[in-house]
Design a protein with these regions (language model features):
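Compact, glycine-rich, soluble single-domain proteins
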Residues: 1-71
Length: 71
C-alpha cells in the first residue's frame, strides 16, 4: 500500500520507491530506503510527518504515493 494511506501510529516496511533517480537518491540520503521501517506520526497542512531511523521527515502526498509499504 502507498505510504500516503498509512494512518497515524501505524508502521510499515518500504518495499519499493518509484520516481526520478534524483528523488530516490535524496530519500536514500534521508534514510528512506527499501527495507526501512516507517511510522506515520502526523499530518500537517496536507503533508505527512513520518519517522524513519529515528528521524522525522515531512513529505507531500505526491511523493508519499510513490513509496510502497508492506504493513
Amino acid at each position: 500500500m502507498p505510504l500516503s494511506m498509512l494512518q497515524r501510529g501505524e508502521s510499515g516496511v518500504v518495499k519499493s520507491i518509484h520516481g526520478k533517480p534524483k528523488d530516490i537518491h535524496h530519500l536514500a540520503d534521508l534514510g528512506l530506503v527499501v527495507g526501512a521501517t516507517v511510522k506515520a506520526v502526523n499530518e500537517v497542512a496536507g503533508n505527512l510527518i513520518i519517522e524513519v531511523k529515528g528521524s522525522r521527515l515531512a513529505m507531500n502526498k505526491v511523493m508519499a504515493n510513490r513509496i510502497i509499504l508492506e504493513v
